[in-house]
Regions:
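Structural signature of nuclease core domains in nucleic-acid processing machines
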Residues: 1-158
Length: 158
C-alpha cells in the first residue's frame, strides 16, 4: 500500500502492473510480491473508506512519529514525573475537508468474521495514533478506522 500510486485508475491490471514495477525498482522482493493479494487491494479501493482515501487531496502513508506521554497514562503504577517516548508508524492518514481520517490496515485472521475482537485489541494503538496525528498536523481527527483485509471491512475506532 505504501508505494501504490492511488491517483491512477486502480483496476486489477493496473495494481498488478504497479506491483511488478515495485519489484523492478527493488521496492519489493519477488518473495514479498508472492504474498501481495491483488484482488484484496482492488476490493479495498471499492469500499467507502478506499474511495475516500483515493479522493483526498492529501494522503500520508507509512508516517513515523515519536510523542512524549506521561508514564501514568500508560501504566498508573508508574511515577507521575516519568515520561515515556511512544513511537510508531501510522499506515495512513488523509485529509477530508479540514479534518483528518486515520486508517490502519490489518491482515490478521478475524475469527468468526467478528471485528469486535480486532477493535478491542487495537483501540489503544489507534487512539495513540490519533493523539500523534493531531500534534503533527494541528488538525482535528474526524475518524479512525481499521481496515480488516481478512473480512474486507472497515471498522471505526472511537
Amino acid at each position: 500500500m505504501q508505494h501504490l500510486n492511488i491517483s491512477e485508475s486502480l483496476t486489477l491490471n493496473n495494481i498488478k502492473s504497479q506491483v511488478d514495477e515495485m519489484v523492478n525498482k527493488k521496492l519489493l522482493t519477488e518473495k514479498e510480491k508472492e504474498v501481495v493479494n491483488i484482488e484484496m487491494l482492488h476490493d479495498f479501493f471499492l469500499t467507502d473508506i478506499g474511495k475516500r482515501m483515493k479522493a483526498s487531496n492529501y494522503v500520508k502513508r507509512e508516517s513515523s512519529f515519536v510523542i512524549k506521554k506521561n508514564a501514568q497514562e500508560i501504566m498508573p503504577s508508574l511515577d507521575m514525573d516519568d515520561i515515556i517516548l511512544f513511537q510508531g508508524i501510522i499506515d495512513c492518514y488523509f485529509y477530508e475537508d479540514d479534518e483528518v481520517v486515520i486508517l490502519d490496515y490489518k491482515t490478521d485472521e478475524i475469527i468468526g468474521g467478528n471485528p469486535e475482537s480486532a477493535k478491542n485489541e487495537y483501540r489503544t494503538q489507534i487512539l495513540s495514533y490519533r493523539e500523534a496525528v493531531e500534534k503533527i498536523t494541528g488538525k482535528t481527527v474526524r475518524a479512525c478506522y481499521l481496515y480488516l483485509f481478512d473480512i474486507g471491512q472497515a471498522v471505526e475506532i472511537s
